[in-house]
Amino acid sequence: LPFFLGRGPVELAGLAGQVPMVAPENVASVGLRSVDDLERLNVRGTGVHAFTMRDIDERGMTAVIREAIAAASSGTAGFHVSYDMDSVDPSEAPGVGTPVPGGLTYREAHLAMELIGDSGSMASVEVVEVNPVMDVANKTAVLGVGLIMSALGKRIL
């Protein structure tokens, strides 16, 4: 993220010939609960929209995701979703590099992706931070595939 926001070595930050490659006000990070000092610097005071687990607990996933979508799609032709599986609680997604308790539930994760898909503004999507060595019975990978399917339109009915 820092490189896309124009931070870091110019060889990387300016790779696309435009610095920043992504306007900070069009970036939303949802489900934060364990943020290191460098990450905190890359969010605070940059214009990035950051939503913690407390925001989700207090306001609900629907309100948070709608605000994130509004930010990401404001003045853009669409947005990219990079879904970090570390955001999901390790009881649901054990196969991640940084398992931290208190993450998103299975349903919160799917609801977020369903709402993103419903927006019609998602241009691309990826799932990141899956560690097969740490996974249990492929649970995290299967959830990741399911989340992509939710973003692409799979629904209960």
What are these regions (language model features)?
Residues D36-L41, E67:
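Redox- and metal-dependent alpha/beta enzyme cores, enriched for Fe-S-associated oxidoreductases
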Residues A23-E25, G45-V48:
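A short helix-to-beta-strand connector/capping loop
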Residues L1-P2, V125:
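Hydrophobic alpha-helical packing residues
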Residues T46-L157:
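Catalytic cores of soluble, metal-dependent hydrolases
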Residues A16-V22, N42, S73, G117:
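Solvent-exposed alpha-helices and their adjacent loops that cap or buttress functional pockets
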Residues P2-D37, A63:
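Active-site glycine-rich loop that binds ribose-phosphate moieties when present
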